[in-house]
Amino acid sequence: MLHVSIRHAFRHRPLYLAVLSLFSLGAAAAPEATPQLPEVVVQERQESSAAVLEKKSNTASRLGLTVRETPATVTVVDRRQIEERGIETTQEALKSVPGITTSSAPGSPGAVFYRGFAGASVTQLFNGITVQYDAIAARPVDSWIYDRVEAIGGPSTFLFGAGAVGGSINYITKLANREGNLTELKAGYGRYDASQLAGGTNRQVGDSHYLRLDVNRNAMDGWSDGTKREAWQLAGSWLWDLTPALNHTLAVEYQNEKVDRPYWGTPLLRPVGGQIAIDEGTRFKNYNAHDGIYEQTVRWARSVLEFKASEALRLRNTAYHYDALRDYRNVETYAFNATNLAVTRSNAQLQRHDQALNGNRLEFNWDGMLGSLTTNWAGGVDYSVNRQTRYPLSVAGPFGSVNPYNFTTADFFSLPGVSNTHTPDRTNRLTTLALFLENRTRLTQQLALLTGLRRDEIDLEVTNHRAVNANNPAYFERTYRPLTGRVAMTYDLTPNANVYIQYSTAADPPAGILTTASFSQVRDFDLTTGKQWEVGSKFSFDDGRGAGTVAFYDITRKNIAVTDPANPGTTLPVGQQSSRGVELTGTYRLTPRLQVAGNLSFVDAQYDEFNEAVGATVVSRAGNQPTNVPKRVGNLWLTYAPAAGWEIGGDVRHVSSRYADSANTVSDGSYNLLGAFVSYRVGRATRIVARGKNLTDKIYAENLSGTSMAYLGTPRTFDLSIQTAF
């Protein structure tokens, strides 16, 4: 059951009213007699492998290009793949993107590692909108309300603003559509008392109104002792065709998630050096406070107005609002003593994040001629105000030691030095005005030139609510004016194969993220600069039964913050990090019943110039590999239909070893995860699926939290689900 306090209910009231008005207005606008609609037939589809290259992606370009036409590594994980691969969360969807690894560790639950970069260097968008707090705001969300997930590798600041050196990811919600009446229901149950109930419906009301509502509830007892999770998502939208050329979509979303006694990690056996070791007896242990908690409430609202002025000119205006409230109450750090006979608990954190974003984006698309050459333009202006206040209370501890296997932990507020008080630390206000422009001109029938440019003016204002000193002034402000872009060419070797080359740039903060930045992190530094060269090819073959992509890239990020060798207490914007790699994707329908798909990436990432303070000494880490970045990541999916209505399949994921520290002295081992499923279709619209994940019950680190802890991945799970549509 969803528990909402009176205070939270008051905060939610605008959302409730918006949802009610959405459907009541739609109903009011409908005539009394609803016209007959064409019958919607839901059946199993077999699309060609080449279709993956014909999907359009607005994340990689605003020009309306297909994956094949875009001069970059672009991945589109659509609704069909989400269901076929048993993708339960937004983060699981990223396994379908070559090279990406993720972590949902509570301290950074939206962590994504892409092309050797992480944090603010990988932008995560929600319907094309960035909240500039991705490592926290992009916490995994249940996939039911999403239509697809898109990703573009490499610098892409020119599309969506500061960040995106390693790439950009876009989570796109289901919206009301004109494709007919459809209702979908799903129920599932699995290990650790995991349950899901979900429903969605798309309805035409009258001649010009279309409504959609999706609701999902997911709950489970976590595999770690004492952990319980309950999450709700609601997405509603109303599409209104005001005229044949003008339409408006109102879309709202509500998300609430509560995790009791979150799992923060497992201590590493000492001595810690070389490859890490996990005591299997502690795999399921939870050393957090007995009443530890994480809770978040998120609301989105978007108003999208689209106008087709002519066959050549289209306009689109998006007004958007986002607000989120997140609460943490946890003991977050655990370490074995020297003899591995006791675990010391420390680092108690009472934290609140209160964030709100408001903005408006006006865009245009124009298709025309430049002399005798076909040309396409897209551009616009985006203005937003992003405000966040954080309320941290941190008590280092330690809070005593416990037996690693048989223990109880005290309530959070019984710990010495902890109080139930939320005191603001600082408020960051980020005002952004951006102009952006893209063009694609076909120089010949085979050769096209693509360019993109973006200019941002970013005003950062930080108000300190606590003690003032030289490193923490009462107020400071900074202004940044990055200019970023992309220039690329594509050449069609044949109607089914092309090659491309591109150069792109990016900009992001030298350390941290601007929505939480402190004076010591930004000082008088400018944004870092990133640049990439990429060459690649996209092709289909065997009459569309097979398709593939290959890409080679080289990325350099300059002016990152590093420790000053002459003064270990300060930083200088002189560091540099680089990565170069290869990414491969492929899919092939071997027979009408058998299909294989996969991706593989190799990355060589390193610090080129990087200093780290070790006590009072400054040590160079130049040449070392960034933490939590594997050199190799691969995925393989195999699906076979042995008889009518039946389907079986398996998948394997490989991740090579990673380092836990920038000194590269501690690492985990590589790991392989195996999964399998069997499904049976009852009639044309109902599907029953049994699925297993991590079938070998591999103990592996999803994330390495320094040299004392590892955040372990989920053990073996099984689940059974039924989904129907009518």
Language-model regions: role of each:
Residues 18, 353, 377, 624-726:
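Conserved C-terminal beta-signal and adjacent last beta-strands/turns
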Residues 102, 113, 129-153, 176:
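Short acidic/polar hinge/loop motifs at secondary-structure boundaries
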Residues 144-147, 153, 158-236, 242-246, ...:
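Outer-membrane beta-barrel translocator/receptor signature
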Residues 218-222, 235-241, 245-308, 321-355, ...:
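Acidic/polar loop-and-plug regions of large Gram-negative outer-membrane beta-barrel proteins
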Residues 241-243, 355, 373-378, 382-386, ...:
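Structural signature of Gram-negative outer-membrane beta-barrels, strongest in the C-terminal barrel
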Residues 299-323, 346-464, 549:
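Face-selective signature of the C-terminal outer-membrane beta-barrel domain
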Residues 306-320, 324-332, 492, 498-500, ...:
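Membrane-embedded beta-barrel scaffold of Gram-negative outer-membrane proteins
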Residues 446, 545, 554-556, 573-662, ...:
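Gram-negative outer-membrane beta-barrel transporters
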